[in-house]
């Protein structure tokens, strides 16, 4: 397994303090989040970056991202309301998700830029705007004719096919709506700067094609996310300097042709992901047939993905299970460490649910632990609490805390 890089002495001290009163919890590092957020804004000065609220909507974390100048990538009406509560303006909030209900559309029509996911959804937004007696600008989520790495695109549940979008825009019959921009997202977790640069180039070329249609008033292009964080010991951090250079070379000429078009990128899990940790307490220790088990608090129900990664690896017969973001990012995506030193031993870490599936690591080497000792799981700052089945067995939900730069702990 990985060594526990990133949990500095401040974080370890905060975790040890919380373990006096909590059996399991999420701990987010404000300094780490801000550092990574600023790395993004420095690298893409010509783009507005949207924080992907679905990655981690914990209010103190979302507030940090707002303070760093990020807008919001919202995937629900509730996330739109969260962004508004943080003080974000309508132009900074993009609501892009398939299957928006009429209720969702009515509630958010004047709070965010709605990005229509289908022709039917355009009609529903038109109906809502007509009912309110207003005219609104919207975006269109486009399913490109190309794939992420070039070549022909594949069928998708997301967006309007590029060819269909061109037809719609050349025969626009929605008098209360103006198509003002596009949103594209084809892949999460890409570590290749060259692959991302090619994707950006293809999206901007497509934006030019759509910008030449009758109805499109191209005022924004949202290129989605894709910038990966390391989720395997062999992964290297994305070289943002290389990506910055490639993006600038594309953005400059595009802005020359479309002076009013604003470029957006989505942050995905980049800022909070490596800056979050799940800490759980050893509740019991037992030996069965010579095998050591540590029973910990709130493991599978508190942080699902490590247990899910083990299940996928165990039951996949190929030995190379396909990634399925954000649920499965690889078998070695979550480094495990302890808050104490000691003689090494081989242990299996399980949770306290009444299911044999509640195992997060099997036969790993850790310092010998006793009841009450803490175990730390990394890469828990994004798609962690939001994806976990807290209601399982009616156990207590793990709390979340932000370790502020001042040293204070903030919860909700």
Model-assigned labels for residue ranges:
Residues 146-284, 393-395:
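Active-site loop/helix belt of alpha/beta enzymes
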Residues 1-130, 134-136, 174, 178, ...:
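A charged N-terminal "starter" segment
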Residues 96, 117, 185, 224, ...:
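Conserved residues at the C-terminal ends of beta-strands
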Residues 27-34, 55, 59, 74-77, ...:
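Electropositive phosphate-/nucleotide-binding environments in soluble metabolic enzymes
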Residues 55-57, 78, 99-101, 118-120, ...:
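Active-site-proximal loop/turn and secondary-structure-junction residues that shape catalytic pockets
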Residues 33, 54, 76, 108, ...:
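Conserved, mostly hydrophobic/aromatic
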Residues 258-412:
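Charged (often Lys/Glu-rich) extended helix/loop segments that serve as interaction or gating elements
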Residues 48-50, 69-71, 90-94, 113-115, ...:
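Structural preference for beta-strand elements that scaffold enzyme active sites
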